């Protein structure tokens, strides 16, 4: 039946069909977590962009949680730790339980576990991070980081509600090479939330970041106020594979505006000086913020002092010699491994992602919906990602070769 086609044409068909096939497409699934983020990335410039996410400013309603996240939660063995109650900024547990004991291990009581990132190894390594972005002052901070060639040396723990209301600022950080991580959706005391609410706070922030960053799934999160215990740790790790990042020193830059009677730019800088210009050699993982002009001013004043005193600045992942994202190695242009909507593996070419955000109307070969009826697809890794399911590639190659062989025989 192929006799009317020329040998050259059939040979070309074989080459074309075989060309997209790469061994990397046949690798095992990178992580079960990648299956939890299946929606095609909406266009942040589209008028309906916000409709793809829960409302900013409050914990997402449980009804918005994709069923896949809840199913994963059901498989996680959680410790017997009660939900805490907020009490003047300090979570308390029922029956006067001690939040510092090993079973609860609340960082509010300065308890941390081996898996937490607390203080980086190595001498004079400053693990640079900023919480609470993006804000109005974030673009100026990102400009300063770029001017000093340290954009990729900073981790930004971002708030989900801020991400979706200021996506262009996030894209600036991505394009500059900043390392993005999770700071929850609405900045609550996490130990006071139910298991499902914890999932919503983390998962939706991860989704928003992944959508903007080419499908790169965050690997790190920092609890607001440092409020984390073993129950919350277990959910973050068990459901989403997240690593909990704490701090070994609080700069109190946040308090300049919150507690002006106790803290000022000068007093915070004076404390900062003791850390970066003194005799300390142990690595630093500081609590810093991109909240307002005061917090940015403190950093811009102290950074040159630290460098002059021999400190090397690295983002959190690099400071601990770990990869940047759950499904990608180092940088915002490394290869991304994700799951397609059909549950098959695709590998994207390295690309800067700020110019390749997928359309909100992108189509897919199958449909998966969350509990709120929202269509979910894989987080788009790049517009250059192949749209053919990997399961079809070997068979297409065999078919093409068969056609060529048939032509020869004819």
From Swiss-Prot:
Binding site for Co(2+): 132, 183, 187
Keyword Metal-binding annotated: yes
CDD domains given in the database record: CE4_MrCDA_like
Catalytic activity: [(1->4)-N-acetyl-beta-D-glucosaminyl](n) + n H2O = chitosan + n acetate
GO BP annotations, alphabetical order: cell wall organization; chitin catabolic process; fungal-type cell wall biogenesis; polysaccharide catabolic process
Propeptide residue interval(s): 19-39, 386-410
Protein name as it appears in the record: Chitin deacetylase 3
Annotated organism of origin: Cryptococcus neoformans var. neoformans serotype D (strain B-3501A)
Top-level taxonomy: Eukaryota, Fungi, Dikarya, Basidiomycota, Agaricomycotina
């Amino acid at each position: 039946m192929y006799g009317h086609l020329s040998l050259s044409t059939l040979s070309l068909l074989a080459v074309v069909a075989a060309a997209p096939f790469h061994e990397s497409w046949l690798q095992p699934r990178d992580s079960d977590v990648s299956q939890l983020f299946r929606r095609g990335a909406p266009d942040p410039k589209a008028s309906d962009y916000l409709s793809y996410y829960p409302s900013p400013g409050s914990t997402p309603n449980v009804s918005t949680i994709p069923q896949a996240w809840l199913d994963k939660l059901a498989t996680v063995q959680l410790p017997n730790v009660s939900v805490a109650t907020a009490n003047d900024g300090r979570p308390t547990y029922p029956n006067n339980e001690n939040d510092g004991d090993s079973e609860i291990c609340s960082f509010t009581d300065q308890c941390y576990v081996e898996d937490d990132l607390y203080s980086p190894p190595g001498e004079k390594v400053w693990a640079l991070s900023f919480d609470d972005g993006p804000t109005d002052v974030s673009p100026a901070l990102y400009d300063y980081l770029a001017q000093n060639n340290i954009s990729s040396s900073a981790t930004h723990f971002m708030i989900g509600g801020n991400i979706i209301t200021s996506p262009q600022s996030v894209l600036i950080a991505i394009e500059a090479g900043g390392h993005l991580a999770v700071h929850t959706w609405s900045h609550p005391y996490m130990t006071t939330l139910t298991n499902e609410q914890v999932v919503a706070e983390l998962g939706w922030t991860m989704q928003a970041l992944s959508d903007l960053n080419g499908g790169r799934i965050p690997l790190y999160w920092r609890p607001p106020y440092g409020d984390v215990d073993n129950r919350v740790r277990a959910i973050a790790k068990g459901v989403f594979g997240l690593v909990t990042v704490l701090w070994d020193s609080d700069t109190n830059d946040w308090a300049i505006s919150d507690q002006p009677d106790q803290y000022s730019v000068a007093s915070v800088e004076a404390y900062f000086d003791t850390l970066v210009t003194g005799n300390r050699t142990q690595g630093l993982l500081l609590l810093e913020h991109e909240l307002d002009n005061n917090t940015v001013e403190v950093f811009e004043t102290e950074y040159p002092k630290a460098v002059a005193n021999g400190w090397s600045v690295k983002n959190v992942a690099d400071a601990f010699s770990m990869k940047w994202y759950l499904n990608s190695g180092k940088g915002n242009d490394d290869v991304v491994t994700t799951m397609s909507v059909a549950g098959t593996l695709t590998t994207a070419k390295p690309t800067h992602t700020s110019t390749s955000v997928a359309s909100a109307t992108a189509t897919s070969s199958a449909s998966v919906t969350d509990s709120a009826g929202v269509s979910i697809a894989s987080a788009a890794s790049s517009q250059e990602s192949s749209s053919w399911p990997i399961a079809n590639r070997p068979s297409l190659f065999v078919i093409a070769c068969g056609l060529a062989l048939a032509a020869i025989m004819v």
